[in-house]
Design a protein with these regions (language model features):
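Structural alpha/beta core scaffold segments of enzyme domains
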Residues: 1-304
Length: 304
């Protein structure tokens, strides 16, 4: 395709068959988990043991980092009295190679973890929601591995409202003693997901704001808009921080990253949290400089 494009001077489309897609591109990793949990009679988690084998296929790709990200996510949702004991292995096999898919190992580990929590609840005769309420991460929780603090959490309120609107208690009672081949059930699961790649790697982001002569601002971001709505979020964050209207912030979705400030890219759901925070800091400095100059020109305080 590259040579054809060079010869003809026009873009060339590569269209793979379904078989070629699975055989010669990347697939999501299949991960086998072995989970053990020590729990007190009241449902409090004491210690957890985690072992995972990630099927990498024939080539490395994102294998080790996805396996590490899965194990890192396993400890986020629930707190236990002891530090999580975890071993993760990447296994090379002769199937299609695993690569970076949406969720980056976390959907696999969350499925295993939530199925395991249901098993624990059943083993001690406890309501699955009550078990989660007793152990889930709360505001103020400090991750023992990264030192990151959870400053806000609406998880308990979400569980309470979900239980109410789904009719959890009523349905569990109604479905308790069923017979026959076709039965009804009610279940729930929680999901946690982090932004960025820290502590596996460092995060870097930057932004530039230029004041135009008409009183609008040009926003330059190295964080790429790929259809996820990042430019809309950046516009709103800049406008709110500076005090401008949204329409007064101009951003080009196809910015040349050779001109914009450096950013590591669009991945890991990082742009609002990481790139957006860089933008917020920039917007605060931008606003302060405008107000300082206004004070100089008008000979009056900015808050008057």
């Amino acid at each position: 395709a590259f040579l054809t494009m060079q010869a003809g001077g026009r873009p060339v489309e590569i269209e793979l068959s379904r078989e070629e897609t699975f055989a010669f591109t990347r697939v999501r990793h299949a991960i086998d988990f072995s989970l053990k949990t020590a729990v007190r009679p009241d449902g409090r988690l004491v210690a957890r043991r985690y072992e995972a084998y990630s099927n990498q296929g024939g080539y490395a790709s994102h294998g080790h980092s996805i396996a590490a990200n899965a194990s890192n996510a396993y400890r986020h949702l629930y707190q236990d009295e002891q530090v999580l004991d975890a071993d993760t292995y990447t296994v090379y096999t002769n199937i299609a190679s695993g690569g970076a898919m949406r969720g980056y190992g976390i959907p696999q580990v969350n499925f295993a973890m939530e199925a395991h929590m249901d098993d624990v609840a059943r083993a001690i005769g406890m309501d699955p929601i009550d078990l989660r309420v007793k152990n889930c991460m709360r505001q103020g929780y400090v991750d023992p591995g990264t030192g990151i603090t959870c400053y806000t959490s609406g998880l308990l309120g979400c569980l309470d409202q979900g239980k109410k609107y789904i009719g959890w208690d009523e349905k569990r009672k109604a479905y308790a003693n069923q017979t026959g081949n076709v039965r009804r059930g009610v279940g729930m699961a929680m999901f946690s997901y982090k932004t960025g790649v820290y502590p596996i790697s460092l995060e870097t982001a930057s932004a530039r704001l230029v004041l135009n002569q008409d009183g609008t601002a040009q926003l330059q971001m190295g964080a790429t808009e790929i259809g996820q709505g990042a430019d809309t979020v950046f516009t709103q964050m800049a406008a709110e921080t500076i005090g401008f209207r949204d329409e007064d912030i101009h951003i080009v979705s196809t910015q040349d990253t050779d001109v914009t400030p450096f950013d590591t890219g669009a991945y890991a759901s990082r742009q609002t949290y990481v790139s957006g925070m860089a933008l917020k800091k920039t917007a605060k400095v931008f606003r302060a400089r405008i107000l300082n100059y206004a004070q100089y020109m008008l000979k009056r305080a900015a808050n008057t």
